[in-house]
Structures are given as C-alpha cells and as structure tokens.
C-alpha cells in the first residue's frame, strides 16, 4: 500500500494500485492545486489590469500637456499677427525688394504685350461668332414661321377633339346613370337574399337549441338507464349470492363494463379480497361510491355492497389488508 503523503505521478493520473483512501486524498490535493493555480491566474490578471490603467492615465496626461502647449503657441502667434497689423510695421524680406526692382518691370511689359495680342484675337473671334449667330437666327426665324402655321392647324384639330370629348363625356354620363340604376337593383336583390339567409339562420339556431335540449334529455335518459341497469344487476347478484351462484358483472354508472377498463371480474367475495387498493378505488369511482382515501378494509366492504354480495357468507367474510 502506498503512503498517503506522496504521489509519484505529480497529480496527472492516480496510480492504478492505490487504495480508495489514497485516491480520495489524491483528489482533495488535486482540487487544492487547481484552486491555487486559478488564484494565481486571477492575481496576474489584476496586476496586468492595474498596469494598463496606469499607462492609460500617463498617456492621457501627456496628451493634455501637449494640447495646452499647442494652444498657447497658437494664441501667441495670433496675438503677434494682430499686433503687427495694428502697428503697420510689417517688414517684408529684403530679397522681395531686390526682385521687384530688377525683374518685375520686364515681366509686366511681357504681360501687357501678351494681353494686347489676346484682345485682338478675341475681337476677331467675336466678329466671326456674331456672323454665325446672325445666320442661325435667320434660319430659326424661318422655322418659327412654319411652326406657327402648323400650330394654327393643330388648334383647329384641338377644337374638334374637344367637341368629340364632350360627346364622349355625355355618353359616359348616360352609361354611369344606367350602371348606377343596375347596381341599386342588384343591391336590393342582395338585401332580400340576406334577409332570407337571416331567416334561415334563425331557424337553424332554433333547431340547434332543440337538438341541444334533446341531447340533454337523452343524456339524462342514458344516465337513468345505466343506473337502472346497475341496480338491476346488483339485485340480481343479491339473489344469486343467496342461492350460491357466482355474481354477474355490474356495469359502471357511465354504462362501461369493468372488463373494458382492464379490471379483473368480481364473481365472489374472495375476488374483492384479491384486488389491489388502486383497483378497488377504480371500482368504487365507477359506481359513484363515496369513500375516504385513508380507508383500507372498509373500501372492500363498500365494494362488496356495491356489487350486491349480500349473502350471509359474504357479509361474514373477513377481508385482509391490501398487499
């Protein structure tokens, strides 16, 4: 048997030859080892989270300081620019003055000469464009004259179309009047049919009420008939019991036979004594016999009386407890 203090497998798998006690000790130590490892992992996570929060705060502080410096510098630049504009002492670089004195004059001369040539070119192009536009305007004017003639013809056709439209509208109005009259006639016929159907529905409702009443009466008759059959069979079993014959099956109040419910037949008082409590309760419920769930032997006596086993031998029979 191995010692309870040491395990050579380093908590990987229990050795196959250990006893049950060794195995229980191994399991407890393994659980403690797992809990210790999980606690160490949680501690590492907490330290990493604290370090992350510290770095994030340092970054935010650095960004705020940089933004404050930039805002200060921008504000200083704007103040200096406003001060220079108000004093009028803006100093241009020296190279701008030298460049303006030496090269700017020649550049302006070349620009002015080029602008003159461009103006001449534009004037010639404008004259050519004006001539072309005049010729196009004349063509358009001629086309407009021909279009005016066509428009006059179209006006005449439009007048004819309006007259034809008026005639069509008159015919449509007549058709609408005739259609409206026909629809009213059809609607009156449908209303008459609806009234007839309503009358038929009322008759059907009356017939359904009568049928429901007949069903209730039939159910009452069936209940009375089943109870009458049950009492007749019960009295018959009383006579048969006195004469030493086997009892006949007594049907339930709903007309079903006990055999149809999977219950064993009752032909003598010994058959009742062999029933289980569940079977005895099922018999009593079928016959409508009131009982207490705590009863035992009294349940069998109630069932004996319910099936008509009233002979002296049956009433003196000593029932046993349920198995």
UniProtKB/Swiss-Prot annotation:
It holds the Pfam family Mug135_C. Keywords: Coiled coil. Residues 27-63, 131-225 form a coiled coil. The keyword Coiled coil applies. The keyword Mitochondrion does not apply. Transmembrane segments: none annotated. It comes from the Eukaryota. Belongs to the UPF0612 family. This is UPF0612 protein C569.01c.
